[in-house]
Amino acid sequence: MTVMKFDLIKKEGKARRGKISFPRGDIQTPAFMPVGTYGAVKSLSPVELKEMGADIILGNTFHLWLRPGTEIIKKHGTLHDFNGWDKPILTDSGGFQVFSLGKMRKLTEEGVTFKSPINGSKVFLSPEISMQVQRDLGSDIVMCFDECTPYPATEKEAKDSMELSMRWAKRSKDAHGDNPSALFGIIQGGMYEHLRDESLKALKEIDFDGFAIGGLSVGEPKEDMIRILDHTAHQMPEDKPRYLMGVGTPKDLVEAVYRGVDMFDCVMPSRNARNGHMFTSEGVVRIRNAKHKDDVSLLDPNCDCYTCQNFSRSYLHHLDKTQEILGSRLNTIHNLTYYQNLMKNIRQALEEGRFEEFRKEFLENYKG
């Protein structure tokens, strides 16, 4: 029996305003989860993440298992004790990272064998091992082990991949056993709507605490992503959280909320920040462009983050050009605050019954 509780507070069309409750704290949805692959969101402290409004962060099973390893983390207690984040943590199962290894992996019914990207040693990962690692980490939300269907894939390739993921989903559920943490199933099936239907049906029969859409934002055209979202999101169980994995841009988030999604994660705001690619209320600003060299204006006058309250575009441009670590930090603080504020504004619009109006205005005004 999971300790997670989900409350659907309000709906507008397909868009949902909700709350996911855990002993470690509540997650107001729609929610964006900053990505802390190795247990830390790059350059930021837990205090800073809380100040910007994050209710939950994402850690990566694959990377934490390889380094530092669960034995070291268990000496502290859980991942929360190790990294100082006392709110909920979701851990990805490692399936996507194995997928990204490409030809360096060997896939069988039992699991995946691959060379460690750290020291080249032979490593084996299976649904059972992934569930044990996530139990050891003390994850609040555990993701079942799956194979992320590559793009492009023929219908047969997508079907074979999806069916393997469904068998692994059942093994994940069995191995999860009496773990009170929430376990989410992952819908696969590539760009084929009927395969997505088959996958969702299988996952409903296994019965999970939440449902995720996987295998999107892997190189497919935007219209295909929207088509699969349109087809799939509203069919997911109404009484459980819906999570879109690895997506995406501010526009993607607004459009996915419109289609009924509750949870998101993406490396984009933090990774792009380190490359001087800033998200603002008016669209994307590329701070390393020469035109910002003598621009004394604030990055985003509509933003309340530390960066926007204290530093000019000119200074941020200077930090980027000189590759100062502070530049990465200030940029990351801004981008993640922007994403958290976007979700807060979406939640408020849903509470006030004006999300459709908010969406229309956002899509008209946001450039990039």
Curated annotation (Swiss-Prot):
Enzyme class: transferase
Residues reported in the UniProt entry to bind Zn(2+): 303, 305, 308, 334
Catalytic activity: 7-aminomethyl-7-carbaguanine + guanosine(34) in tRNA = 7-aminomethyl-7-carbaguanosine(34) in tRNA + guanine
Pfam families the record matches: TGT
Co-factor binding details: Binds 1 zinc ion per subunit.
EC number(s) from the headed UniProt entry: 2.4.2.29
Sites where the protein binds substrate: 92-96, 146, 188, 215
Pathway: tRNA modification; tRNA-queuosine biosynthesis
Keyword Metal-binding: yes
Signal sequence bounds: none
InterPro entries noted in UniProt: ArchSynthase1/Queuine_TRR, TGT, TGT-like_sf, tRNA_ribo_trans-like
Example GO biological process: tRNA-guanine transglycosylation
Region of interest (RNA binding), ranges: 246-252
Enzyme active site: 92 (proton acceptor), 265 (nucleophile)
Gene3D superfamilies named among the record's database cross-references: Queuine tRNA-ribosyltransferase-like
GO MF terms, alphabetically ordered: metal ion binding; tRNA-guanosine(34) queuine transglycosylase activity
Listed cofactors: Zn(2+)
Keywords carried by this UniProt record: Glycosyltransferase, Metal-binding, Queuosine biosynthesis, Transferase, tRNA processing, Zinc
GO cellular component: cytosol
Superkingdom of this protein's organism: Bacteria
Record function comment: Catalyzes the base-exchange of a guanine (G) residue with the queuine precursor 7-aminomethyl-7-deazaguanine (PreQ1) at position 34 (anticodon wobble position) in tRNAs with GU(N) anticodons (tRNA-Asp, -Asn, -His and -Tyr). Catalysis occurs through a double-displacement mechanism. The nucleophile active site attacks the C1' of nucleotide 34 to detach the guanine base from the RNA, forming a covalent enzyme-RNA intermediate. The proton acceptor active site deprotonates the incoming PreQ1, allowing a nucleophilic attack on the C1' of the ribose to form the product.
Subunit structure: Homodimer. Within each dimer, one monomer is responsible for RNA recognition and catalysis, while the other monomer binds to the replacement base PreQ1.
Similarity comment text for this entry: Belongs to the queuine tRNA-ribosyltransferase family.
Name the record gives this protein: Queuine tRNA-ribosyltransferase
Gene it is expressed from: tgt
